[in-house]
Amino acid sequence: MASEPRAGPVMPMASLGPGGPAVSRVGLGLAALGRPAYITGGRGRDLPDRDVNALRARTFAVLDAAYAAGVRYVDAARSYGRAEEFLAGWLARPGHPGVVAGSKWGYRYTGEWRLDAGQHEVKEHSLAMFGAQLAESRALLGGRLALYQVHSLTTSTAPTPASRITRAASATVCS
């Protein structure tokens, strides 16, 4: 396990919208760390061991380095495999004040931790998917989840009108 992270100088901060949380202007996305095959395909020399424990340890080390460099915003998504789980484990360790966690819904991870999976995610923007994925994200990240975004919503992929999703999100997130 990585050593206790040292807090370096915090980067300049910015608000995520009016009244939103203050975050570092540079954030860290966990897409390539939360699942064994994504943009890391063909990177066997850089990531020789891709089992769950190895990628969890790698995620913790990267998060420790980012925190020491002043990064205070971390982005995950339900489709990033175990990214939320890894982030939650790292946040549970002492020494990470001021970290803002964000996540996204709209894709379901289907790769089952296999490098050779033909399909790694399925896009779905239904109200049912929103509710299920928000509950999963909250179960993992709890009160540290400060921003929840839709992943790649377009008029052609949204079976539910955006206004209904917006109302559901407002009612769910604000309650």
Task: Indicate residue ranges for each PLM-predicted region.
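N-terminal binding-site loop/beta-alpha segment at the start of enzyme catalytic domains
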Residues: 1-104
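General helical structural elements
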Residues: 60, 108, 168-171
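Short acidic/His/Gly/Ser-rich catalytic and metal-binding motifs that mark active-site loops
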Residues: 34-40, 109-113, 157-159
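N-terminal entry module detector
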Residues: 86, 91, 100-132, 136-138
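Acidic-and-aromatic substrate-binding clefts and catalytic sites of carbohydrate-active enzymes
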Residues: 77-85, 109, 154-159
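Glycine/proline-rich, positively charged
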Residues: 44-50, 117-175
